[in-house]
Structures are given as C-alpha cells and as structure tokens.
C-alpha cells in the first residue's frame, strides 16, 4: 500500500481530480481545500498580500495506482509549468499486527 500526497495550487485542482478519477475510477481519497503554505516560489495564504491557496489530496492506494498517479501528475506539471505542483509517495502499512 502506498500513501500518495499531492499539494498543489488550487487553480489545477479540477484538472488533477478529473484525470485521476478518469484513470482510476474506484480511487478513494481525502481532499483538503484552502491549504496555506510556502513553497519555493511564493506563499499561499489566501489573504490580500498572498491571495492564492493550495489544495491537498491524500490517498492510500495500490502501487499500480500510485504509478498511474505519478504519470498523471507529470502530465499536469508539463501542462502547468508555472504552478506550484508537488506529489509524494510513502510506503504504508495496512495494519500493525
């Protein structure tokens, strides 16, 4: 099992979700909109000085699905090269015995 975490500018949220859901129809995820933070280029605070915000998507999924998500995110990154788009993968345990 793999934990997938995507943190990205909210401007690409719809594109990310549309592609992931079309390629992995049974995907389960948690979406956190309105995420504040600071990346390499800018802050995202949702205020008058730094008006943009991020979103965060977390999913626990198979290695096969994680590879699909990696491919999708590479495509999104090429389509939107100036947006802050990051994604991470961590091996996860289903249960502790």
Regions picked out by a protein language model, each given a short descriptive name:
Residues 1-97:
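Positively charged, small/polar-rich N-terminal and surface patches that mediate targeting and assembly
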């Amino acid at each position: 099992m793999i934990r997938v975490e995507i943190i990205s500018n909210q401007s690409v949220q719809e594109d990310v979700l549309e592609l992931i859901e079309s390629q992995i129809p049974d995907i389960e995820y948690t979406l956190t909109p309105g995420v504040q933070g600071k990346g390499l280029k800018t802050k995202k605070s949702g205020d008058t000085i730094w008006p943009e915000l991020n979103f965060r998507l977390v999913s626990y999924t198979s290695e096969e699905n994680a590879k699909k998500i990696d491919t999708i995110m590479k495509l999104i990154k090429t389509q939107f090269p100036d947006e802050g788009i990051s994604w991470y993968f961590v091996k996860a345990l289903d249960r502790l015995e």
